[in-house]
């Protein structure tokens, strides 16, 4: 498996492909708007369970480097000050994945950051950490199924 396979899968995912990745937990990941040829500007609908919480949102690709990185900005009607970054690095026989959520305003908007902390709570962070440590090992089987 390579980092390019991971970023290609995430950039061109369909609901069916996403559901096969983690059945019953990954519900939807599909494009809702098409951006540039490099996927910047693409909007996707994501729907999955993070622990017991169902997370549904739209996200816009704001940065894409095939085989290296995808950055989505979360959107609920308007673009929010929250970003999901997936960075991949090819290593001998594997791919190292770094999954980061960044949230918060700059400037005067920082006064509203406590509202984000209500959503991105320590409990949510722990559930997301467990989720990511389960889902990314599963992607190998999704991209390279073993012979039955």
Description of each model-found segment:
Residues 1-36:
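Hydrophobic ligand-binding cavity/cleft-lining segments
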Residues 2, 66-67, 91-94:
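Short strand-connecting beta-turns/loops that link adjacent beta-strands
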Residues 2-5, 127-131, 135:
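Short amphipathic alpha-helical segments
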Residues 17-18, 68, 79, 101:
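Acidic, low-complexity intrinsically disordered regions
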Residues 74-130, 141:
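Beta-strand/loop substructures that line and gate deep hydrophobic ligand-binding cavities in soluble
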């Amino acid at each position: 498996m390579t980092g390019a396979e991971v970023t290609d899968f995430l950039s061109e995912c369909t609901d069916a492909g996403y559901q096969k990745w983690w059945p019953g937990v990954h519900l939807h990941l599909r494009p809702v708007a098409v951006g540039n040829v490099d996927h910047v500007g693409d909007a996707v609908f994501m729907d999955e369970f993070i622990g017991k919480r169902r997370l549904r949102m739209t996200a816009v690709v704001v940065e894409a480097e095939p085989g290296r990185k995808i950055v989505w900005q979360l959107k609920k009607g308007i673009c929010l000050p929250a970003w999901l970054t997936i960075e991949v690095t090819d290593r001998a026989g594997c791919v190292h994945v770094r999954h980061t959520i960044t949230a918060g305003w700059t400037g005067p908007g920082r006064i509203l950051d406590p509202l984000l902390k209500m959503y991105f709570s320590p409990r949510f962070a722990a559930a997301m950490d467990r989720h990511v440590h389960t889902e990314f090992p599963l992607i190998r089987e999704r991209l390279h199924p073993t012979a039955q």
